[in-house]
Amino acid sequence: KIPEVEEYTRAELLAMEKETAGLYLSGHPMDEYRAAVRRAGIVPIGAILTDSASESEKKTYPDGAVVTVAGVVQSSRTRTTKSNTLMSYINLEDDTGAMELIAFQRALDTGSIYIKDNAPIIVRGRISMRDEKEPQLMADSIRPITDLGKLKPEPPRTNADSKLWVKLPGEDDPRLARIELILTMFPGQQQMIIYLECEKRRIGARCLIHPSLIAELKELCGDANVFLEAN
């Protein structure tokens, strides 16, 4: 008698297809969530990629836009930054496309438990455009797909005109070099101003204004020396 073997679940079958063929053949893991995703106002990854590739100057999802996406984790890797905090690169795919997410310590503190291969997740964050690269998403929060019902539709928002101020005593302050290093992890086109108090001079820089960036700067320079000016 041939022993009975439990049938694979749909999710297991799809994962096997992806592993062996390099693509999903009989469907996509996000198919069963499509209606709920639409009701929640989730932005399709393909829409972000298409908008980025468009030659139009007026973007629907510009640098710094806040969006929520949902998809399955294709891969992830975590490393420790020079400021001794964790940073993860996550490849997320929905049924319209795939994009890279970057999650820092703040998002990982509550969301790392959900980052598993083939796991469906919801990610809220800010779009980061850099040079000719495809857009990335700087994650603010990572949640399980079961939280879909708790989401309310909302349009993408930007704070493109905001300015981030950091105050230092002078140019010889060793923290200036640390700030420059931190900024390399938050590429973007939003304005940051470092005010050198003794010299009464300003240094301008461009970055993606992100909660994790603000948190890192406050830890380095003190809460009173970091200020977000929202226009």
Where is each model-derived feature located?
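Noncatalytic, beta-rich nucleic-acid-contacting surfaces in large DNA/RNA-processing enzymes
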Residues: K1-N231
